[in-house]
Amino acid sequence: MEKNHSSGEWEKMKNEINELMIEGRDYAHQFGSASSQETREHLAKKILQSYHKSLTIMNYSGELDQVSQGGGSPKSDDSDQEPLVIKSSKKSMPRWSSKVRIAPGAGVDRTLDDGFSWRKYGQKDILGAKFPRGYYRCTYRKSQGCEATKQVQRSDENQMLLEISYRGIHSCSQAANVGTTMPIQNLEPNQTQEHGNLDMVKESVDNYNHQAHLHHNLHYPLSSTPNLENNNAYMLQMRDQNIEYFGSTSFSSDLGTSINYNFPASGSASHSASNSPSTVPLESPFESYDPNHPYGGFGGFYS
DNA sequence: ACGATTTGACCCGC
DNA sequence: GCGGGTCAAATCGT
């Protein structure tokens, strides 16, 4: 039995992530007792930064699996190699989840979307769960081969709580837009829509190291990094007015490791990045709470 | 007419 | 065999 890629490398990542998360937690603590607006802002940045970095690493590791192992399916085929299909096995995809709460007062008809357009492709009753789980994938899966997917499930007890788990990395052009539209409009020339994630991941990691020291007073530290962070759903959610970021995000890799974090976050970001750049407030997968429409979102398929 | 959603069937890993 | 995830035909909405 061997793991996907050098476990030493993974160990390193794991440690790094761990540190980052602890760091984030500390900031979150401070955030709670921070009095001045400035301090809070600063701390918020820090917190996001920690998460961002962690995710970047997670994503990076996910890609690593795919590339170096040409599929990353740990077992079942040891001598069987699919021709150059980087058909990322789901297992090796980066994955994280977060809880989102629908603000009671806010109109439920507002859109909560994480900036991407999703298409629902399935719904399933989950054992022990009161509500069904919705399965979504990126609208551009077919056209652009974007593999990102997510699952949305309403919490048993608290109907105002949604648990969303994301998988895979957005490689669609939308990824470039989301990441930049929302935080701040300072695109860099390198943000072409053509970049594949494999490159982006690495670049991102590198960039991050530079930019971590460079962000000035951008609204969000993440703004400067390309594509990748679009997967940072947690922050995308924070920006929404109707949904409060609930303060719990967990990342997990395939290697049986998972890290959970809870913190008292009060997302207060404002801007407006929705899937449709201009008009139609496309319903979000999360909030259709009609008896008829458990979730909005997308549904779709693939040959 | 076309794209999105619904929903039962199918597939696959445990 | 069971449960979770995906497919794809039918249906719905625009």
Curated annotation (Swiss-Prot):
Biased composition annotated in UniProt, kind: Low complexity: 266-278
Functional note: Transcription factor. Interacts specifically with the W box (5'-(T)TGAC[CT]-3'), a frequently occurring elicitor-responsive cis-acting element.
Keyword Transcription regulation among UniProt keywords: yes
Assembly mode: Interacts with WRKY53, WRKY54 and WRKY70.
A GO cellular component annotation in the UniProt record: cytoplasm
Residue segments, region Disordered: 65-92, 266-291
Protein's name according to its UniProt entry: Probable WRKY transcription factor 30
UniProt similarity note: Belongs to the WRKY group III family.
Keyword Nucleus: yes
Coiled coil: none
Portion annotated as DNA-binding: 107-175
Induction cue: By salicylic acid (SA).
One Gene Ontology term of the molecular function aspect: sequence-specific DNA binding
PROSITE patterns recorded: WRKY
Keywords attached to this entry: DNA-binding, Nucleus, Transcription, Transcription regulation
InterPro entries per the UniProt record, alphabetical: WRKY_dom, WRKY_dom_sf, WRKY_plant
Gene assigned in the entry: WRKY30
GO biological process: leaf senescence; response to hydrogen peroxide; response to ozone; response to salicylic acid
Pfam family, one: WRKY
Signal peptide: none
Organism: Arabidopsis thaliana
TM region positions: none
Location in or out of the cell: Nucleus
